[in-house]
Each structure stands twice: as C-alpha cells, then as structure tokens.
Amino acid sequence: MSRLAGKTALITGAARGIGRHFATAYVREGANVAIADIDVEGAARAAEELGSAAIAVELDVTSKASIDKGIDKTIEAFD
C-alpha cells in the first residue's frame, strides 16, 4: 500500500520547481494533490500531467480569500 493513500495535500507553488517536485512525489505515493499556484495555466498543465489524482487550484498566498477558496475547491474535489 502506498504511504499516502487516502490523504490529500494542497501544495503551493506547485506549477513548477520544488513545489512541482513535491506534488509529483505525493501523487507517486498515492495522495490526491491540489496543484496550487498563482499561475493557473501552469498549475493546469502540471495537474494534467499528474493525472486524475491532481487538480489545479488558482491560489495567491498573499490573499486570505484566495487561500480560503483554494481550500474549499480542494475539499470539494477530494472529499
């Protein structure tokens, strides 16, 4: 069994770089992952490449409203 099966992670800055690396690793270990990034197009590309265990979430970490919306979308998608 995968170590993260049944778990969900919201990873910020996950459209590229280290965030993307962690998102890939979490999916590989069985987690559902929200690819959260201000670059929604990049997040969508990353989510598409990772498959059905990943969704793209537009999220600006400097905005509480954006954070709340991103969390809500993640819960809705994987609950």
Predicted segments with their positions:
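A glycine-rich helix->loop->beta "capping" turn
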Residues: 5, 51-53, 73-79
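Conserved glycine-rich Rossmann-like NAD(P)H-binding loop of the short-chain dehydrogenase/reductase
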Residues: 29-46
